[in-house]
């Protein structure tokens, strides 16, 4: 059986009526390192001219398989030590040196008697401890015999635990599948939301192209109406020109008939004059007709050239309009594509900034948490170091007390 010695300080200034709870607290202080500060300071008493510490040693406290029973035995021993302490205080030990050798011898004899009585009580406590250990062993053996009927229960418990484990695994698998499906749905939703701006941009581009087509159709209709009006005006001019030419021909023909009805003279001179006048009139008429025809041809040529130039101008205007509309459409399409690209880049930049901020926040939280843990670990390390130093100091103090106790016992045995 392993044993341990428990030391209880006995203050010299305490009265003989000290309650038992004070000594129990001192025993608990010997078990708890945090309460060792409450131990009273050791004082000195003079016995046979020697300076020694007035400590009372409370014998052997059994430890090991008894557990809580050992604690009870120790408390009983502590109660006996308090009685012994009261007898020691009433035995005549003083804080001042004895005036004579007889008083010293009497004090030593009283101390020897108290120690003999104390050793007897220690042997009695050891017997009580052995009896309690035997009872505890019997109790454990009876408990072990009753535990043999637990085989069926263990089998049922094992099957239940296996079923619970399988159910937990199935639940985890289902939760994993659910999370995967949810992640896929979130991915599709995110893709749909990302494609929405591009869809809107394409719809806007299509609407703008429809507007351009409508404008081109309206301009085409305007040009066609202008061409029709120009054709009508050209036809009207050509008809008016033909009517003017016909009227001129009629006027010329009427004047010739009137001039032919003039009476002709009978003389040669008159005949020659008449022929000359007739031929002059014919020449003038031919000249006028040729001039009119030439003028008509020139006007027709000018009209044809003007019509050709107008047609060429209209065709050039059509080609230029078509090219301009194509350029406008291409520029609008390029502008819309650049706008869509700009919006996509802005969204990408915003997402990158957002994720960067989130990552920085997470890293800051991790750093702060690690710093807090580091501070806590440093504080715990400092506390453990202080507790270790405190325990080492009390260990040294207890070793010195045990050494003084052994020296005292050796001197008592040798005496």
From Swiss-Prot:
Name of the gene this protein is made from: BFSP2
Region spans: Tail: 396-415
Segments forming a coiled coil: 115-144, 199-248, 295-395
GO cellular component, one term: intermediate filament
GO molecular function, one term: structural constituent of eye lens
Subunit structure, as described in the record: Part of a complex required for lens intermediate filament formation composed of BFSP1, BFSP2 and CRYAA. Found in a complex composed of PPL (via C-terminal linker domain), BFSP1 and BFSP2 in the retinal lens. Within the complex interacts with PPL (via C-terminal linker domain) and with BFSP1. Identified in a complex that contains VIM, EZR, AHNAK, BFSP1, BFSP2, ANK2, PLEC, PRX and spectrin. Interacts with LGSN. Interacts with VIM.
Chief location: membrane
Sites bearing Phosphothreonine, chain numbering: 53
Family: Belongs to the intermediate filament family.
InterPro entries, A to Z: IF_rod_dom, Keratin_I
Cell location: Cell membrane; Cytoplasm; Cytoplasm, Cytoskeleton; Cytoplasm, Cell cortex
Record membrane topology: Peripheral membrane protein
Positions of the UniProt region annotated as Disordered: 1-26
Record protein name field: Phakinin
Tissue-by-tissue expression: Abundantly expressed in both the inner and outer cortex of the retina, expressed at a lower level in the nucleus of the retina (at protein level). Detected in eye lens fiber cells (at protein level).
Region Head, annotated ranges: 2-114
GO biological process: cell maturation; intermediate filament organization; lens fiber cell development
Membrane-spanning intervals of the chain: none
Domain IF rod: 104-415
């Amino acid at each position: 059986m392993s044993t341990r010695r428990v030391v209880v300080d006995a203050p010299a200034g305490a009265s003989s009526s000290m309650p038992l709870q004070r000594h129990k607290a001192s025993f608990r202080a010997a078990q708890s390192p945090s309460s060792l500060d409450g131990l009273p300071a050791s004082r000195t008493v003079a016995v046979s001219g020697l300076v020694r510490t007035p400590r009372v040693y409370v014998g052997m406290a059994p430890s090991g398989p008894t557990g809580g029973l050992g604690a009870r035995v120790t408390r009983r021993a502590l109660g006996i030590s308090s009685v012994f302490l009261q007898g020691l205080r009433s035995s005549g030990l003083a804080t001042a040196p004895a005036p004579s050798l007889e008083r010293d011898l009497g004090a030593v004899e009283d101390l020897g008697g108290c120690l003999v009585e104390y050793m007897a009580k220690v042997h009695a406590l050891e017997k009580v401890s052995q009896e309690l250990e035997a009872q505890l062993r019997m109790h454990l053996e009876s408990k072990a015999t009753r535990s043999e009927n637990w085989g069926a229960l263990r089998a049922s418990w094992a099957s239940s635990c296996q079923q619970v484990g399988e159910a937990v695994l199935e639940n985890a698998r289902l939760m994993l599948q659910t999370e995967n499906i949810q992640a896929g749905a979130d991915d599709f939703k995110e893709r749909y939301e990302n494609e929405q701006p591009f869809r809107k941009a394409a719809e806007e581009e299509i609407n703008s192209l429809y507007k351009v087509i409508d404008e081109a159709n309206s301009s085409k209709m305007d040009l066609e109406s202008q061409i029709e009006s120009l054709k009508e005006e050209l036809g009207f001019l050509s008809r008016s020109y033909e009517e003017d030419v016909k009227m001129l021909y009629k006027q010329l023909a009427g004047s010739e008939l009137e001039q032919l009805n003039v009476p002709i003279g009978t003389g040669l001179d008159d005949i020659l004059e008449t022929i000359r006048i007739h031929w002059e009139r014919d020449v003038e008429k031919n000249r006028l007709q040729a001039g009119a025809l030439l003028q008509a041809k020139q006007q027709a040529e000018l009209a044809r050239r003007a019509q050709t130039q107008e047609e060429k101008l209209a065709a050039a205007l059509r080609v230029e309009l078509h090219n301009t509309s194509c350029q406008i459409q291409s520029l609008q399409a390029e502008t819309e594509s650049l706008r869509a690209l700009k919006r996509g880049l802005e969204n990408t930049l915003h997402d990158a900034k957002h994720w960067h901020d989130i990552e920085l926040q997470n890293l800051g939280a991790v750093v702060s948490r690690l710093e807090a843990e580091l501070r806590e670990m440093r504080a715990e390390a400092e506390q453990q170091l202080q507790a270790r130093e405190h325990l080492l100091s009390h260990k040294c103090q207890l070793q010195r007390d045990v050494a003084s106790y052994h020296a005292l016992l050796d001197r008592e045995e040798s005496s």
